[in-house]
Each structure stands twice: as C-alpha cells, then as structure tokens.
C-alpha cells in the first residue's frame, strides 16, 4: 500500500452517475422512498454542473434506460416530476432524511425538487 506505484481505480463518470440517479427517480416516481437520490442529483449538479456535458449525460441516460428496460417519453418524465413535487409523502420523507443527515442543513424539499426538475428539463428534455 505504501509502495511507489500507481493503482488504477475504475469509476463511473459524473454523467453516468447522474443518469442512473435520474432514471431511478423517474422509474420509481412517488413510490421512491430514497429521497437520497434527489439530494445526490442536487449535490452533483450544484458542485459539478459546469463540468457536465449535455450529450454525454443524454447518452448515459438513454443507455441506462435501455439497460434497465425502462423507456420514458418526455410526457412521462414531466408527469412523474409533477406527481413527485406535489406528493406530501415525499415531502415527509425529505423531512426525515433532513433530520437524520446533518449535511443537508435547512435545504427545503421544494428547492431540491425544483432544482432536479430544472436539471432534467435542461439536460434530458
């Protein structure tokens, strides 16, 4: 471990990570109990948004959907986002997530879901 050599570590690029999170958000809709996915999209885009390449993210999203056998139309995505943003249970889950994860701070559910929705519109629709 302390040798003088290089160790290669293979990781996903940011676009693939985002694509998988976004696909999960859309696929699960209001049945998604993992509001962490929303926080992850929010955080990644907040920190690395300028580095995200739209065509790479779009292709990664398409490949993720194909691999998971879940194809969505623009209308599907918009309808799901509307349902999620209006769902009171999702807001409650966010409150629980917020209380148990100090790093979330006072970040409100509405801010997160609006940000995620705008990100999807900008990059995928």
PLM regions: where:
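Structured mid-to-C-terminal alpha-helical surface segments
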Residues: 1-125
């Amino acid at each position: 471990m302390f040798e003088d050599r290089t160790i290669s570590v293979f990781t996903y690029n940011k676009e693939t990570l985002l694509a998988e999170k976004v696909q999960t958000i859309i696929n699960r809709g209001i049945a998604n109990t993992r509001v962490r996915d929303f926080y992850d999209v929010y955080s990644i885009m907040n920190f690395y948004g300028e580095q995200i390449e739209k065509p790479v993210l779009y292709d990664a999203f398409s490949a993720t959907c194909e691999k998971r056998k879940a194809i969505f139309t623009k209308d599907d995505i918009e309808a799901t986002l509307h349902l999620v943003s209006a769902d009171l249970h999702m807001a409650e889950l966010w409150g629980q997530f917020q209380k148990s994860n100090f790093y979330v701070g006072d970040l409100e559910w509405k801010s997160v879901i609006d940000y995620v929705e705008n990100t999807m519109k900008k990059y995928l629709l």
